[in-house]
């Protein structure tokens, strides 16, 4: 069992003077790719890795997240100057750590165009795989599967990072439509973003007192041990 999350702390800010060896991130990503199972071995997602040199893109991501926050709260703000004013008058969001993260991962859906030998043999025999659909209900079905597998990959990756003394966080407060991500900064994206993950060495963490007031739901609320009715 992966116990690396036992001492997990939410990093509100990362140490910009601390440098993670690129090979450590590369090895963690490769191990996650190798160890994460996938339905029919399609892995219907892509992980876009932004390193230290992508400071402008990370800054832009922060403002995209903040704009999405205003939308979620029923007060949509798209003007950047108005967003800056909003930023000054509201509590700093947890996803502010995107700006200082050494690495940021953006997960998107991936459509398979080059099936492996076994997959192709089954396709020739009449099998239809939703992971190869380019639109319609089947692509949406593959998207749901991608969400699940992204969770599995990101958990494996997080466990490896935490085991190496590297902090991580997850962000879902961002525009879910690719058209809202400016091409001048995010031309590498080829599908709607599904998850953002930050990676680095934390310099400031969520207060223990806040954490104590924010427990998970009770075990019995989440896990239902079904008993046979006689």
Feature locations, PLM:
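N-terminal amphipathic, basic helical "cap/leader" segment at the start of enzyme domains
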Residues: 1-104, 109-110, 114, 225-230
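Small-aliphatic-rich amphipathic alpha-helix that forms the alpha element of a beta-alpha
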Residues: 28-34, 105, 111, 121-182
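Short secondary-structure junction motifs
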Residues: 42-45, 163, 167, 194
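A glycine-rich helix N-cap at a beta->alpha junction
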Residues: 69-78, 184-210
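A generic local secondary-structure boundary/capping motif
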Residues: 93-96, 183-187
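A short secondary-structure junction signal
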Residues: 116-120, 173, 208-209
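Phosphate/diphosphate-binding glycine-rich loops and adjacent basic-rich segments that engage nucleotide
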Residues: 208-230
């Amino acid at each position: 069992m992966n116990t690396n999350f036992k001492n997990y702390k939410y990093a509100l800010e990362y140490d910009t003077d601390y440098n993670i060896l690129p090979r450590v991130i590369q090895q963690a990503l490769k191990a996650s790719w190798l160890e994460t199972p996938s339905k029919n071995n399609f892995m219907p997602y892509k992980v876009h890795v932004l390193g230290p040199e992508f400071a402008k893109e990370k800054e832009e991501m922060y403002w995209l997240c903040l704009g999405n926050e205003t939308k979620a709260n029923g007060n949509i703000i798209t003007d950047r100057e108005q967003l800056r004013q909003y930023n000054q008058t509201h509590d700093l969001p947890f996803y502010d750590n995107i700006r200082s993260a050494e690495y940021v991962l953006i997960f998107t859906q991936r459509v398979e165009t080059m099936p492996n030998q076994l997959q192709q043999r089954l396709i020739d025999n009449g099998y239809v795989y939703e992971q190869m659909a380019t639109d319609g209900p089947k692509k949406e079905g593959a998207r749901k599967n991608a969400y699940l597998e992204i969770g599995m990959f990101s958990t494996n990756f997080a466990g490896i990072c935490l085991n190496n003394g590297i902090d991580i966080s997850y962000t879902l407060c961002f525009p879910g439509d690719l058209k809202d991500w400016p091409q001048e900064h995010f031309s590498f994206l080829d599908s709607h973003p599904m998850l953002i993950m930050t990676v680095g060495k934390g310099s400031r963490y969520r207060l223990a007192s806040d954490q104590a007031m924010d427990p998970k739901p009770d075990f019995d609320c989440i896990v239902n041990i079904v008993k046979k009715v006689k």
